[in-house]
Amino acid sequence: VLTGINMSSYGVDFKREARKEAIATGDKEDLTGIPDIGDVVIALQGVDGIERIRISSVDPQMITDEFLEKIKGADKLCPHFHLSMQSGCDTVLKRMNRGYSSEEYMDKCNKLRACFDNPSFTTDAIVGFPGETQEEFDETLNFIRQVDFLDMHIFQFSPRNGTPAASMEKQIEPRVKQVRSAILIRAAKEMTEKNLERMVGKKEKVLVEEKV
């Protein structure tokens, strides 16, 4: 399992050092050959004894055409992608400063579906972010159903001292957050059941982690 706080940042430090060296020497900047997380997957693909590779968590901005071109032939890579979402509403995403839109997120999912046979998606969602209206919450509810997640981790927003969100206006009442959380949890369970039902009768290579 490839894991880290920000998987998409792998290789950024290599590129930073290459730029510094180019500036210091006056040479033309050349970033070819500098590895990223896609190169790590390909390297592990060629290691005897490693039969299954999984990426623990993926930032949507990590799913680039270059990354997909590298990993699409990696048959040891488990086609499960935990794509960080937080909200399916663009106005909430903007307040969160997430750096992507719901349309861009869906585009990443569609590109992964084009590269892999029956990939599964899981995600995290926060309900009750400051200022979240009922209409904005409904957008998130509709969006998660469009993506059709296999599973979701759902959290109620809780302010942390010193963060911008903690001092935002229109903090959401605890009861409202509880209700919205329950609605998303129910929707997530329904999606899980439908995803599992689609697998009935199919043969798949699986990894058994514990005795059933």
Place the predicted regions along the sequence by residue.
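C-terminal, non-catalytic macromolecule-binding modules
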Residues: 135-181
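Conserved SAM/AdoMet-binding glycine-rich loop
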Residues: 1-134
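Hydrophobic alpha-helical packing residues
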Residues: 44, 112, 144, 184-191
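Hydrophobic, well-ordered secondary-structure elements that form the walls
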Residues: 83, 124, 144, 152, ...
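Glycine-rich, charged/polar anion/phosphate-binding loops
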Residues: 40, 67-70, 138-142, 190-193
